[in-house]
Amino acid sequence: MQSLNYEDQVLWTRWKEWKDPKAGDDLMRRYMPLVTYHVGRISVGLPKSVHKDDLMSLGMLGLYDALEKFDPSRDLKFDTYASFRIRGAIIDGLRKEDWLPRTSREKTKKVEAAIEKLEQRYLRNVSPAEIAEELGMTVQDVVSTMNEGFFANLLSIDEKLHDQDDGENIQVMIRDDKNVPPEEKIMKDELIAQLAEKIHELSEKEQLVVSLFYKEELTLTEIGQVLNLSTSRISQIHSKALFKLKNLLEKVIQ
């Protein structure tokens, strides 16, 4: 495990060697901000029916699982290991719950069908306004539906990946890039190139929001402050960008 201060070393020793409950509680409190962070990012665009308190509970289960299974002797930061466990626990919990109502699923299918129809008609990407006009919906309703539908697709993709893994996915995901097989590196580089090409098809503002959110790790509110736009407007831009990228993500795991 990478260098720790003396206090943390004592906590980890008491927890791993003696299973001291107080040390476990102290470590849970110490790393709780990780749970808050991942809940904040995953909850972006989720339906209002999904409560953050429920996500926090799932994330805390993931954090405890990480404390139970982490090996401090490895040259690995606990934050890195715990992040995968926390995110995985939240995604698994969402996938097991029918968090997207049937009416929302039907609406998502209608929007996706309209997009396919309009893109065939105009031979280009279509805007939420054009989709709204086609379906007799408001633009905001279309954007919200796109957002919910995209997250449902992500859960589906995550489930396919989960079904294909060998139980060691976390170890694989956090291994040293130097040990990646050449053929896997080629595939990874090709995927990055495809994503980069697709991202370049986004509008300048969409590219900026995606970069600030995923690379710089700003919140939607912080991005709004940078661009002098409301949080709801940034959320709309973010939703549109992700919707445009989802087809590529789906093709990658087929």
From Swiss-Prot:
InterPro entries recorded: RNA_pol_sigma-70_dom (IPR014284), RNA_pol_sigma70 (IPR000943), RNA_pol_sigma70_r2 (IPR007627), RNA_pol_sigma70_r3 (IPR007624), RNA_pol_sigma70_r4 (IPR007630), RNA_pol_sigma_FliA_WhiG (IPR012845), RNA_pol_sigma_r2 (IPR013325), RNA_pol_sigma_r3/r4-like (IPR013324)
Family label: Belongs to the sigma-70 factor family.
Subunit (UniProt): Monomer. Interacts transiently with the RNAP core.
Polymerase core binding (motif): residue ranges: 54-67
Single annotated GO MF: DNA-directed RNA polymerase activity
Species in which this protein is naturally found: Bacillus subtilis (strain 168)
DNA-binding region: 220-239
Record protein name field: RNA polymerase sigma-D factor
